[in-house]
Amino acid sequence: MRKAKLILDRDYEISPVDKRIYGSFVEHLGRCVYTGIYEPGHPAADENGFRRDVLNLVKELGVPIVRYPGGNYVSGFRWEDAIGPVDQRPKRLDLAWKTTEPNKVGIHEFAAWARKANAEVMYAVNLGTRGPQDAQRIVEYANHKGGSELSDLRIKNGAKDPFGIKLWCLGNEMDGPWQMGSKTAYEYGRIANEAAKMMKWTDPTIEVVACGSSGSGMPTFGEWEYTVLNECYDNVDYVSLHRYYGNPHNDTADFLASTMDLDQFIRTVGSICDAVKGKKRSKKQVNLSLDEWNVWYHSNEEDQKLYKREPWGTALPLLEDVYNFEDALLVGLMLITILKNADRVKVACIAQLVNVIAPIMTRPGGGAWRQTIYWPLMQASLFGRGVSLMPRVECEKADTSHYTDVPMMDAAAVMNDGGEVTLFAVNRDLKEDMELKIDLRAFGTFTKAVHSVLHHDDVKAVNTEACPDQVKPREMNADLRENTVVLPAASWNVIRLLP
């Protein structure tokens, strides 16, 4: 059995945890909206056509904010197409995903659904094929009380009260050649700055997110962030990061080490923000919005076949990754990395919420179930609210195909207002259990410990509609007398220490 030690001190804080790091993402892509959250005629549909069974799973997940409506989709989207009488809305070709969009769900319907889900809306504006004036107009439509043409139009369309959307994305992945209206860093920085100014002049209470690089592998990564922020630093609040990982070569140990890369990515972008801050002699800190993150690779080949079989279809089953147990472990490790960077990462949205690379799956006309990755997301959101503490981990390390000195255990710790401390830990070792000694200096005495474990002997095990509980957390014995717990091989662990 491997040995590890975790040292915590209540005075060694990283930062208060912004609850928005447990956010998600709904894009008009595949079956995320249609036959995902929205399916009129389904036995579980409410009066507005939204599935109650899906809504209940979303509420259980504890998602505080949802990014909408894209994604690549937003760079060709006209928000006016999705307001007014539903039967009069146009169908449009979506060039981003080669499908047909019926516009049955728009800002009115989605805002009403988000309220039921106890979630805020994080709205993305189109800065690809549109510009600053259109971005200002949607803020006026959504957030202005009344008395102007656009706010009165919202009232006419059934929403007397403003939607009160507080967080806005200035486009999506504008460095990507796959993006409609992609731009150079300077071009985008100028447009983002003007859009942010006009949006904030309309509603001074909002915050905005500038597009960072689409990923750290982009040829302009780093240079893009610096150039963009040089143009818009004073008017933006966050810069976005997007990061996905996969295991196409079936190298689980290397796959589980991927968060070494994520941590470096986060720290690098934070440093670039600070470099621009220093250059401008600014007192303002721009923070990070990791508003797309997940495992994504299972469905890639099938998606290409589907495009050939059904060009320009509606609600096609695109990006429907079926997640296995090792994917859940990596999602847990990514959550740990986010918590350890809580001083800079203030927003994070797992992409996406339902069916499309998602923790929740549905069958049209049928059931809804939790994928393996649902569990670490739910537990982190439920127990990871409070102050992120600085963990000192002592454990063995190993090398993988692409990474060196990978700790066999990674962990984060959060203390809530009631003095409860929750540890999130992953044992990366695929074969050996790990005895973890927890050193709680300066904490005093805890009266009770609760240890939840997510483990399966088969790292490729999945949850399905027929077998939805193949991979599910279970409670284990926790004895505080020795301040020691056992982390099973290849496991996600939630250890709650109650005062």
Task: List PLM regions with ranges.
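Non-catalytic accessory regions flanking glycosidase/transglycosidase catalytic cores in CAZymes
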Residues: M1-W224, L229-Y238, L262-D263, R267-Y307, ...
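Active-site His/acidic residue clusters
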Residues: H242-A257
